[in-house]
Amino acid sequence: LPVWCPLALALIYAGCRTVPPVAHPLAPLTANEIRRAVRILKDSGRVPPGARFSLVALDEPPKELVLRQVVIPRRAFAVVYDDAANKTWEALADLDAGRVDRWKEIPRAQPPVSAEDSGLADGIVRNDRRWQQSLRARGVDAGSVIVVAWSAGYFALPGAGEGRIVRAIPYLGVGRNFYAHPIEGLVAHVNLTTGKIIDLLDTGRNVPVPRESGELALPATGPPRLAPAPLDILQPRGPGFQIEDGEVRWQKWRFRYGLHPREGLVLYTVGYEDGGRVRPILYRAALSEMMVPYGDPGGGWFFRNSFDAGELGLGVNAVSLKPGVDCPANCAVFDAVFAGGNGEPVTIPHAVALYERDGGIAWKHDDETRRARDLVLSFVATVGNYDYGFDWIFHQDGALEMRVALTGVMAAKAVAEGTHEGFSHRVAKNLAAPHHQHFFTFRLDLDVDGAMPNRVVEMNSVAVPPGAQNPYGGAFTMEETPLLTERQAQRNLDLASSRKWIVINPNVMNALGHPTGYALLPGENALLLAQPDSWVRKRAGFLNSQVWVTPYRSAEIYAGGDYPNQSPGGDGLVKWTAENRPIDNHDVVLWYSMGITHNPRPEDWPVMPVHAAGFKLVPWGFFARNPALDLP
């Protein structure tokens, strides 16, 4: 072959290396692509000196082009923030053409709080005389203090309307778990733009700093118990899944995934092999937003209602997973790469795990039994004091499950011995953990047997009134109600009726003549306890309902809006659905919020045992019979 290798020959001879392989349109950006995107933007002369890259990620191409397998130029989406001017820009860089396709300032937008912000806040408070005096009054050496920057929220407070704002919270830096040593009643409301403290809370000088160890490693945890008997997980012939050009194939499932800097794990083009073809189920599924509101009204706590995805980022806070510890020994692990604030790629080794595990009994009757196997796609994000594990679990019976595992260190406050108040619970000497909630909102772009048309049906089990149709009092029926508009589709759970929702394709019938579908089966949940007129609820309006349905729009990704940091609310789902658009026989997106109310207990300290919650998407008339019937 000639060394120049014509394109036609390159398509025939896979060994020709002069033509790079074409990335799948949904493949995450590589380190080289991140570098190229940043270079394109900087070379355009638009990026101010010293500006930081808050986000650089794949600009996902139009869904219809991806599904048609059209060759699409690779583009990067970037968020650029200039600290000096307090300005935010969105940019699109065409990686193939080497040009800037978009550069737009976004007024009043504040990107997520980052490590750079913590460093700035730390420097500002340490140089403030009031802060120094407050520490001395508590007998605390400023050199032993660790400052953590919290997102400030929004409460229409004086002086907080302009600039980039955070709350600076101090801890005594004793050991690795400094969260066990809060310096109570000292919180600085910091304007990072002006370099000044807006307001300084200085109460609780009479509250001692907790000194009891909160360390999580030996010998602080005490003598270890007798180790359990060895349990080895072996796959002598290797894993049962294959990955071809970024697509995972396992037990009739097919899907792609990426680790997004903000959303964390994203599933793409999920389908199931049936009858010699791959039937589509989901186009895209990911966590859209998180919100963690605290119930303590005190000055050092009322503002703590973090939007962990939109204000901090989940993917960028992913941690490296250790096989045999964070995931089973038989797991395959994969790196993730993101852009640092300076635009240089940062690699997180072993950020994602993929593994098979025993799934218990798949089905059984009498002496006929089949054992199940699960495939788990997993990552863990450490967001400040809390750790969140996210598992997408693929079952052989066609069910897809999301499991969120909550662990880590609770946010605790210092209290004087012998005192008690109703907004927290004592967990250790001089320590109480305020009551709080965790909410997770997922965006599920279901394409059941295709994107168009889909319909969402609500199902309620209803008791039949006593009478001729219910002579013995035990009869109940199932009512199905199509949801036709966005307003009608703002729904909540109902235990009394075992409420569930099904996305069906009215144009595709199963063997029994019914539309094929997939149902959302909720798990543990809770209602937001913040008052209707509170800023907490105004900013998290997407939690007013546990289920929303919208017509598919590629730009409608984040339930709380694109920039929730310092936002007064009103964006995202609340804004989009105000139009009350029709959703029947459309390409629809199902939004589901689940919540956990955490009333702390001593057993949650100094580290919280895993508390898991989740939901399932299960086939509902999608197959002719139990799809796991063919298990060997």
Features from the language model and the residues they span:
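Exposed beta-strand-loop-beta-strand "reactive/processing" segments of non-cytosolic proteins
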Residues: 48-95, 142-191, 251-253, 377
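Hydrophobic or amphipathic alpha-helical targeting/insertion segments
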Residues: 84-85, 91-133, 191
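Short loop/beta submotifs within extracellular cysteine-rich repeat domains
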Residues: 48-49, 86-88, 98-101, 132-133, ...
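Extended effector regions of multi-domain proteins
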Residues: 95, 104-113, 175-265, 269-399, ...
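Short, glycine/acidic-rich hinge or "gate" loops at secondary-structure transitions
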Residues: 138-144, 417-424
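Bacterial Sec-dependent signal peptides at the C-terminal "C-region" and cleavage site
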Residues: 12-23
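Bacterial N-terminal signal peptides
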Residues: 2-14
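Short, non-transmembrane alpha-helical segments in secretory-pathway proteins
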Residues: 25-65, 114-156
